[in-house]
Amino acid sequence: MKKRVLSFLFIITLFSLTAVSASAVVNDTLKVGIRWGDMALEAANLENAVGSGYEFGYYDEDREFVYLDETDETTITMQASGSGNDVTVTETRSGEVLFQFRDNGYCLGIRPMGRHTETWCKGYKYPGGFEYRCNADGTLTVINVVNIEDYVKGVVPYEMDKDWPLAALEAQAVCARTYAVKTRHPSLGFDVCAGTDCQVYYGRNRATDMTDAAVDNTAGEMIYYGGKPADTVVYCASNGGATEDAANVWSSIPYLVGKKDPYEAKTNIPNYNWTVTYTADELTWILEQKGYSIGTVKNVYVAEFTPMGNVSKVTFEGSRDSVTVKGETCRTIFYSSTYNKSVKSQRFTINGAGAVSGGIYINDSNTVIRSLEGVSVLSGGGKTVRLDGSASVLSASGTSTVGEGQTPAFSKDGTFTITGSGSGHNLGMSQYGAKAMAELGYTYDEILKFYYTDITIK
């Protein structure tokens, strides 16, 4: 059994520690941040899943592993030591020092011995190797250095239900692969993170034969626009009945164009319709925390809808001032961890704005809804259809349209009820919509070309 204490000094000055390519994929390899920032570790443990040891070295500018030494031990711990990116490697149980890495331009790299070996790190099983970057507070940023196809195999079952139809999983694989090719976190030393800021990735824990097949079937395929990989391939859980133009949420992106989505209505979506209620005091506090000092909130209403029926402007009127927010802020401004409340999508109404004051009675006097958004009804032609927020109905006083309008929602009891459908920013592919299309027999490329305008897949 090899237990060596080695110290290496590298005279390497040509490449900066923070230099990461603008294109994330170098030699088909990604650097994925799995523990960083507040999640960085004082001591980082690894356990080889198959009982083999590890090689010590570093990853060069081409992401090729440069071998320095090895150990037969299967459980090891890394801790920052000395200055710069100096790291000490010990055997986890005994504390015996196995390797001492001293840097002058690179970071410690570790990879398991053997081909296709997987390694346990903080309860998750990862393919590939690891890189360790020392932080000023003595913690370690842990980076998984992994082949892009193995990375996608780790993303798909965390971003989409692993038991969904193959075509939906294939569409998700192409989206995940395309998203990953643009570096998102160069200042942190990795390309993409493993959290919701990028794409959820926890290695191999949830992978199945089906999710792996979705990646293998689409190997190397990405979404292209204008001859280049599309660099903003975003997706959402569900859109509530319509996607949105990116210009109305973030900024203009030519392949993210709003359109009515007839497919979500064809599958079961848990918690598709939702309601959240805020008090005036809660909204006042939330706005103040986000830098809007308008006094006590007196009124909140949707000031503008997009042609797709999504919200593009929300106005808050206070005792001292008023403010109108636009785009994605219409949704995110309502988020509060303190009150554990949020608005789930861009598709909503507030009190009477876009709904009928006091609610709409359906079937009998005991069933009341506040919005027609997402409601299924029997049409004059005898078909069941899902409404998108308004409809013409025959009442005792004649035909009229309900569910329309942007009337300010003055609160009589100091509360504001927001009713909506869908989950997410309403941009790009609806994951539930992809599921529905797959169930109807559409292929993954047909799914992607519905949700992303004028793209090619290659």
Outline where the language-model segments fall:
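Conserved, single-site charged/polar hotspot
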Residues: 2-458
